[in-house]
Amino acid sequence: MTTIAVIGGGQIGEALVSGLIAANMNPQNIRVTNRSEERGQELRDRYGILNMTDNSQAADEADVVFLCVKPKFIVEVLSEITGTLDNNSAQSVVVSMAAGISIAAMEESASAGLPVVRVMPNTPMLVGKGMSTVTKGRYVDAEQLEQVKDLLSTVGDVLEVAESDIDAVTAMSGSSPAYLFLVTEALIEAGVNLGLPRATAKKLAVASFEGAATMMKETGKEPSELRAGVSSPAGTTVAAIRELEESGIRGAFYRAAQACADRSEELGKH
């Protein structure tokens, strides 16, 4: 039976735990560490997992160790547990869920030959609709990578990418939920400005975006084709799209994505 260690029981760590348990994994095979005893107790009561405060204890004989801590702590935690990982009877796989920390930096902080996987998650994994990308280190074999993908698939979709694409991936999936939250927020405000109650405007906007996303995913059609299907000649939608285009919406997304990728690259240098 696979044993999982989750170092850090924050939002991302809890989302992973929730997904694994929903996929019928035995909670007694999931160890979660927290600096806060209160938080650890909360997760134990909610999910029935094993709550620990010692990272090395959690990593002991774990098959997969997920590092769900802030980027600045990744190397520190890896250095802390590397001795335990060396002594495990079977080779453990370490999975970093933090932005900005390269595979090379992690491999240098651990003993030679440690399998390391770098993941770029996003927050919709909190509701089982995440988009996680995986990049394998040089010591990860096909079976180990497949195991990590299977575990991550419990909280959404998974895609393998090259590490050289991570900055672009950060702009496209890691940060993009925030773009959509902002667009939704703006549309809700527009609805209120038109005289709708805020609750009504929110319901209309959120349900419409959810439906549109489902159409793009399930029909396989290009977004431009789906947009054309809503845009009758000289109609209301065409009038709205014209305003958005004249306001420079495409350029705004180009610049936002570039700024995000640039910042991701900058963080990766430190």
Curated annotation (Swiss-Prot):
Q: Please give the start and end residues of each transmembrane region.
A: none
Q: Which domain of life is it from?
A: Bacteria
Entry keyword Cell inner membrane:
no
Localisation per UniProt entry: Cytoplasm
Gene Ontology molecular-function annotations? pyrroline-5-carboxylate reductase activity
Keywords (A to Z) from UniProt: Amino-acid biosynthesis, Cytoplasm, NADP, Oxidoreductase, Proline biosynthesis
Coiled coil ranges (UniProt) are: none
Q: Does the keyword S-adenosyl-L-methionine apply?
A: no
Q: InterPro entries, alphabetically?
A: 6-PGluconate_DH-like_C_sf (IPR008927), NAD(P)-bd_dom_sf (IPR036291), P5C_Rdtase_cat_N (IPR028939), P5CR-like_CS (IPR053790), P5CR_dimer (IPR029036), Pyrroline-COOH_reductase (IPR000304)
Single biological process term from Gene Ontology? L-proline biosynthetic process
According to UniProt, this protein's pathway is: Amino-acid biosynthesis; L-proline biosynthesis; L-proline from L-glutamate 5-semialdehyde: step 1/1
Q: Name one GO cellular component term.
A: cytoplasm
Pfam families in the record: F420_oxidored (PF03807), P5CR_dimer (PF14748)
Write down the chemical reaction(s) this protein catalyses.
L-proline + NADP(+) = (S)-1-pyrroline-5-carboxylate + NADPH + 2 H(+); L-proline + NAD(+) = (S)-1-pyrroline-5-carboxylate + NADH + 2 H(+)
Enzyme Commission number, as recorded? 1.5.1.2
Indicate the family of this protein.
Answer: Belongs to the pyrroline-5-carboxylate reductase family.
HAMAP family registered for this protein in UniProt: P5C_reductase
What does it do? Answer: Catalyzes the reduction of 1-pyrroline-5-carboxylate (PCA) to L-proline.
**Name of this chain's protein:** Pyrroline-5-carboxylate reductase
Species this chain originates from: Corynebacterium melassecola
